[in-house]
Amino acid sequence: MKFLFAFNFFSLYIYLYEFLCIHLCGSQVTPAGTVLNSNSALISRRINRRKMKNCNNNDLLKVLKMETTYNELPAHNLLMSSKNDINKLFDYINKNEELSKLMNSCGTYVYLKYLGVVIFSIKENVQISHLSEFIQYLLNKNVCIEFNQNVML
């Protein structure tokens, strides 16, 4: 019953939002459907990653073996998820001085709370040896990592 009420309330909220914004603000409003579709794609990708035992790809192996450069990477953003709480892992990395320096030399991250994923943006002047070491640490902590061209910080 609570779920049905919450769903109906959410639907009512969306209809009111569409009416007020589109009719009063004009047509310069981005429709909510595209945002929901991109979030659902991230959610389904996260679920797929958690089900897979080996969720890492050949591009990561090239980074680990230091056989690539920044310009040869398929994307400059990494989508990360884990069966464990990935937010706690990144909190630990931030508190550890050595790991924090390593992570900051590689790039920056944003934790998406409701999706339970991290989007990591690789710095343009990253040393592949540092990136390799950071990725190896994450893989040892059972983090699924994917190069993703569709997400940006």
UniProtKB/Swiss-Prot annotation:
The keyword Oxidoreductase does not apply. Residues 1-27 form the signal peptide. Residues 127-153 are annotated as: Dispensable for parasite growth in host erythrocytes. The keyword Membrane applies. It is found in: Secreted; Parasitophorous vacuole lumen; Cell membrane. One of its GO terms (molecular function) is serine-type endopeptidase inhibitor activity. It comes from the Eukaryota. Its main location: secreted. GO terms for biological process: negative regulation of endopeptidase activity. GO terms for cellular component: extracellular region; plasma membrane. It is a peripheral membrane protein. Keywords: Cell membrane, Membrane, Secreted, Signal. Acts as a specific inhibitor of subtilisin-like protease SUB1. This is Subtilisin propeptide-like protein. It comes from Plasmodium falciparum (isolate 3D7).
